[in-house]
Amino acid sequence: MAPLTLSVDVKSSSATSHDVSKRVMQSSQLKINKGFFASVNTQEDKPFDFFRTLFEGFIAGGTAGVVVETALYPIDTIKTRLQAARGGGKIVLKGLYSGLAGNIAGVLPASALFVGVYEPTKQKLLKTFPDHLSAVAHLTAGAIGGLAASLIRVPTEVVKQRMQTGQFTSAPSAVRMIASKEGFRGLYAGYRSFLLRDLPFDAIQFCIYEQLCLGYKKAARRELSDPENALIGAFAGALTGAVTTPLDVIKTRLMVQGSAKQYQGIVDCVQTIVREEGAPALLKGIGPRVLWIGIGGSIFFGVLESTKRTLAQRRPNTVKETKEE
């Protein structure tokens, strides 16, 4: 009886081992890519998850908005007075917190609504678009969030800027007088110019912030710290603020003109400013605006991410992800 022999196909075994190793590496890489570029839960959507994201967005957005507005209101007041001044008018530095309380009453729900709409919209779009189009998802979500928040932002902005320029002494009296003299539409003065400024601003700022965060996470292979989020937020805010300054000047002029109707619309406003004051007038207040929005972006995104993380840690049955070694 011939002895039993065991034949091993070394080439086949090596190939099989190589295939297994390759599949493991591909699986790991897929997880990393999904983590860095999607930043969303890949599990099947549930109604509760949607409403939880919505609720957490409301809380985080409202908190961040109130903190930023309170801290930077004086700079915003100076910026508004610079932009509203015609020719070489002097800027009054008194009453820099004029209208803050009334403005907070509008900023809180507006910021809550913006982030509450932005977060679930972003997550839905990131699941729809491929990874290399994540910027489109962030741009679109930012614009949609800004559109929703504009319903609250515009009346708040009108009242705030009328008070900052000394037309009224209190928010309630401002609302009553504007409504009585200009009608309900007076509270939405400059609405189109507001959208012209804020929709691009929201879309660009959040897109820059999100894309920089994703790139940093990919390079560092870890989550960002609060100071890192704040630094990226400052850069995104300052850059976006500088680019959109002409739009902000136009919006401010249309909102503070009241019933005098010095400008008949966006085009007339631009033409009048350039004709009477020169093109550089469209950049009025760019220094305070960049400073205000840069610092504001730092505070806003720092507080926003910190609040979101705190809320996520308080979720029931939260599964903590292991950090990459």
Curated annotation (Swiss-Prot):
Keywords, comma-separated and alphabetical: Chloroplast, Membrane, Mitochondrion, Plastid, Repeat, S-adenosyl-L-methionine, Transit peptide, Transmembrane, Transmembrane helix, Transport
Pfam families, alphabetized: Mito_carr
Feature: transit peptide: 1-38
Gene name for this UniProt entry: SAMC1
InterPro entries according to UniProt: Mit_carrier, Mitochondrial_sb/sol_carrier, Mt_carrier_dom_sf
GO biological processes: chloroplast organization; S-adenosyl-L-methionine transport
Entry keyword annotation includes Mitochondrion: yes
Tissue expression per record: Expressed in seedlings, cotyledons, leaves and flowers. Lower levels of expression in stems and roots. Not detected in senescent leaves, petals and pollen grains.
Keyword Protein biosynthesis found: no
Effect of loss of the gene: Severely growth-retarded phenotype and reduced chlorophyll and plastoquinone contents. Unable to germinate when homozygous.
GO molecular function per UniProt: S-adenosyl-L-methionine transmembrane transporter activity
Protein name, as recorded: S-adenosylmethionine carrier 1, chloroplastic/mitochondrial
Annotated transmembrane regions: 55-75, 97-117, 132-152, 230-250, 285-305
Reported regulation of activity: Inhibited strongly by tannic acid, bromocresol purple, mercuric chloride, mersalyl, p-hydroxymercuribenzoate, S-adenosylhomocysteine, S-adenosylcysteine and adenosylornithine, and to a lesser extent by N-ethylmaleimide, bathophenanthroline and pyridoxal-5'-P.
PROSITE patterns, per the entry: SOLCAR
Family under the similarity heading: Belongs to the mitochondrial carrier (TC 2.A.29) family.
Topology term for the membrane: Multi-pass membrane protein
Solcar repeats: 52-124, 133-215, 228-310
